[in-house]
Regions:
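Short, aromatic- and glycine-rich surface loops/edge beta-strands on solvent-exposed regions
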Residues: 181-204, 309-323
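Exoplasmic/lumenal beta-rich domain surfaces
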Residues: 253-303
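Proline/serine/threonine-rich low-complexity linkers at boundaries of modular beta-sandwich domains
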Residues: 204-216
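Conserved aromatic anchor
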Residues: 232-241
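Glycine- and small hydrophobic-rich membrane-insertion segments that are intrinsically disordered
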Residues: 39-59, 68, 72-74, 270, ...
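Solvent-exposed N-terminal domain segments of exported/luminal and surface proteins
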Residues: 24-178
Length: 410
C-alpha cells in the first residue's frame, strides 16, 4: 500500500511535459536533407590570369546538395530520384546516385609523415569598430605552440547540429550532385512548388516549398570604404529572409610568415565553424551571446591596423531559415506509437566574399557582388563518399594552419 502511495506521489510531482514524453517514437525509415546555398562570389574585379584558377566557392551562383538516407536495403541495384518543379529549370528530376564506397587502405603506422611545424605567428582579432580593442591581438607563435595552447587558440563555438544522411550512417544512401549529373543550378532557378522523392529503398516523400524556403537573396556589398582613421567600412544590402550574419577576414601580416585573422564577433571567436549552415535556434542563441550579428545589421567596420596590406579576404554569411517536416504527423493520442516514415530538412544560407581594398578617391577595387553580372555558374563538384569529421582540438594547429596557408598561397 505504501509503495502505491509513493508511486502516485512521484507521478503527481512530475511536470506535464515530462509525462507527455512517454509516447513511443519509431525513427523514420528515410531521412532527406536539402542544403541550399546562394553564393555571391567575389565582390571585386579578378586580376588577369587568376579567374581560371579560382575555386568554385569564389565563382558565385546557386548551389544545392541533396542527401537521402534510408534504413531499408535496395531491391536490386539502388536507385532514387528527386522530381523537381518546373521553375528550377533542370528538367523533370535529379538522380540520387548511390556512391560505390571503397574500403580505405590500412595504415601501417599512426604517425603523420610529412608534417612540418609551421613558422611564424597567427594574430587573432575580433569585433566591429574603428579601433582595435584592448587585449588584442591574441598572438599564437607556431614555433612554441603545444596541443593544449592550440586547443585554446583554435577552439570553435559549440553548435548543436543534427547529423545528416551519409554512407556510414545509412543502410542505403543517395546523393546529388554526383558523377552522373553535376549540372549547375540556373541563375533564375526556383525551388517553389511540389517535390517528390522516390526510389527502391525509400518511402515516397512528397512536400511543397514556399517562397520563404526558396533560394535566399544574394549578398550585395556596397563599395568598401577606408575611413580617415584607416579602418575598412563594409556595407551590405539586407537579406530579407536572413536570421543573422557573421563575417571573418584573413590576410598576411607585416612579417611574411604571419597570418592575421579577424571576426565580427563581439567576443573572441575565430569563427571558422560558423561559416556554414546553422539552425535558427542556434543563430538566436549566438545573437544573444553577441557572436552573430542581428538580421537588421547592414554594416561592420574592420578596425584600423588589423590588416596592413590590401590583399585581405573578407568572408560573409547570411544564415537562413529551415524547413523541417515529419510524415506522418505526431498522433495526438500519447498511447499511439508514432511510426515515422520520413523526415525532411531544407536548410539555407547566402554567402559572399570581397577584398578589403580601396582605390584612391574612395572607389573600391571592384564592384558589388551581384548575380546579374556574373557568368554562367560552374558545374557543382560531386561530394565525397562521406562527410569529413570536425577536427579535434589536438589537430587544430595542423589543420587550421594548413587551411589558412593554402588560402594565402603559402
Amino acid at each position: 500500500m505504501k509503495s502505491r502511495i509513493l508511486a502516485a506521489a512521484l507521478m503527481a510531482a512530475l511536470p506535464p511535459p515530462l509525462l507527455a514524453q512517454t509516447q513511443q517514437i519509431r525513427p523514420p525509415i528515410a531521412v532527406y536533407w536539402m542544403s541550399v546555398e546562394t553564393a555571391g562570389g567575389m565582390g571585386m574585379e579578378i586580376p588577369p590570369g587568376i579567374g581560371g584558377r579560382m575555386p568554385p566557392g569564389m565563382q558565385g551562383g546557386k548551389r544545392m546538395n541533396l542527401d537521402l538516407g534510408s534504413s531499408r536495403p535496395a531491391v536490386g541495384e539502388a536507385h532514387a530520384s528527386h522530381a523537381i518543379p518546373a521553375g528550377l529549370s533542370m528538367g523533370q528530376s535529379l538522380p540520387l546516385l548511390t556512391p560505390h564506397v571503397e574500403r580505405a587502405p590500412v595504415r601501417e603506422s599512426d604517425d603523420e609523415p610529412g608534417f612540418e611545424r609551421p613558422k611564424g605567428r597567427m594574430l587573432i582579432y575580433w569585433g566591429c569598430g574603428e579601433t582595435v580593442r584592448p587585449g588584442q591581438p591574441v598572438i599564437i607563435d607556431f614555433a612554441s605552440l603545444n596541443p593544449q595552447d592550440a586547443a585554446r587558440a583554435f577552439r570553435g563555438r559549440a553548435i548543436a547540429r543534427a547529423r545528416g544522411p551519409a554512407p556510414g550512417r545509412s543502410r542505403t544512401y543517395g546523393t546529388w550532385p554526383n558523377q552522373e549529373d553535376a549540372r549547375p543550378v540556373p541563375a533564375a532557378g526556383s525551388l517553389q512548388g511540389e517535390h517528390t522523392i522516390s526510389g527502391n529503398y525509400t518511402p515516397e516523400i512528397r512536400f511543397a516549398v514556399g517562397e520563404r524556403d526558396d533560394f535566399m537573396q544574394a549578398v550585395a556589398f556596397g563599395p568598401v570604404r577606408k575611413t580617415s582613421g584607416g579602418a575598412f567600412a563594409v556595407k551590405w544590402n539586407k537579406v530579407p529572409t536572413a536570421t543573422g550574419y557573421f563575417a571573418t577576414a584573413m590576410g598576411q601580416g607585416e612579417n611574411k610568415n604571419d597570418i592575421v585573422t579577424w571576426s565580427s564577433s563581439e567576443i573572441q571567436e575565430m569563427g571558422q565553424v560558423l561559416m556554414d549552415y546553422i539552425p535558427p535556434a542556434e543563430v538566436e542563441r549566438l545573437i544573444r551571446e553577441k557572436v552573430v550579428m542581428p538580421p537588421q545589421t547592414t554594416e561592420c567596420t574592420v578596425p584600423a591596423g588589423v590588416f596592413k596590406s590590401e590583399a585581405s579576404m573578407f568572408n560573409f554569411i547570411a544564415y537562413g531559415d529551415e524547413l523541417n517536416l515529419v510524415h506522418p504527423p505526431r498522433p495526438t493520442d500519447p498511447k499511439q506509437v508514432w511510426e515515422q516514415e520520413w523526415t525532411l530538412k531544407l536548410r539555407l544560407k547566402s554567402t559572399a566574399m570581397t577584398m578589403l581594398a580601396e582605390r584612391e578617391g574612395g572607389e573600391r577595387r571592384g564592384r558589388s557582388s551581384s548575380p546579374e553580372r556574373r557568368s554562367e555558374p560552374a558545374a557543382q563538384a560531386p561530394p565525397q563518399a562521406d562527410k569529413p569529421q570536425e577536427p579535434t582540438p589536438a589537430d587544430a594547429v595542423k589543420e587550421g594552419v594548413k587551411a589558412l596557408r593554402g588560402i594565402l598561397g603559402r
